[in-house]
């Protein structure tokens, strides 16, 4: 699942580009070829969340 990403400057939905970056693992350069607005390009380049590590660590008993 990819969370929705909206460009705060122009209002364009750039979730599909985020999907290609995170799920399809395309390079940022390849994805940005299809994005024309500079504001959207900047948002994609700087605000993509890295994959989260969802493994649970056991609690350490300090007593």
UniProtKB/Swiss-Prot annotation:
Its EC number is 2.7.7.6. Induction: Expressed in the early phase of the viral replicative cycle. It is found in: Virion. It comes from the Viruses. It catalyses: RNA(n) + a ribonucleoside 5'-triphosphate = RNA(n+1) + diphosphate. It holds the Pfam family Chordopox_RPO7. GO terms for cellular component: DNA-directed RNA polymerase complex; virion component. One of its GO terms (molecular function) is DNA binding. It is an enzyme of class 2 (transferase). One of its GO terms (biological process) is DNA-templated transcription. InterPro entries: RNA_pol_7kDa_chordopoxvir. Part of the DNA-dependent RNA polymerase which catalyzes the transcription of viral DNA into RNA using the four ribonucleoside triphosphates as substrates. Responsible for the transcription of early, intermediate and late genes. DNA-dependent RNA polymerase associates with the early transcription factor (ETF) thereby allowing the early genes transcription. Late transcription, and probably also intermediate transcription, require newly synthesized RNA polymerase. Belongs to the poxviridae DNA-directed RNA polymerase 7 kDa subunit family. The DNA-dependent RNA polymerase used for intermediate and late genes expression consists of eight subunits 147 kDa, 133 kDa, 35 kDa, 30 kDa, 22 kDa, 19 kDa, 18 kDa and 7 kDa totalling more than 500 kDa in mass. The same holoenzyme, with the addition of the transcription-specificity factor RAP94, is used for early gene expression. This is DNA-directed RNA polymerase 7 kDa subunit. The lineage of its organism: Viruses, Varidnaviria, Bamfordvirae, Nucleocytoviricota, Pokkesviricetes. The gene is RPO7.
């Amino acid at each position: 699942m990819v969370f929705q990403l909206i460009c705060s400057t122009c209002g364009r939905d750039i979730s599909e580009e985020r999907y290609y970056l995170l799920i399809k693992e395309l390079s940022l350069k390849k994805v940005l070829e299809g994005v024309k607005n500079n504001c959207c390009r900047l948002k994609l380049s700087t605000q993509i969340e890295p994959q989260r590590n969802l493994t649970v660590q056991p609690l350490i008993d300090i007593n």
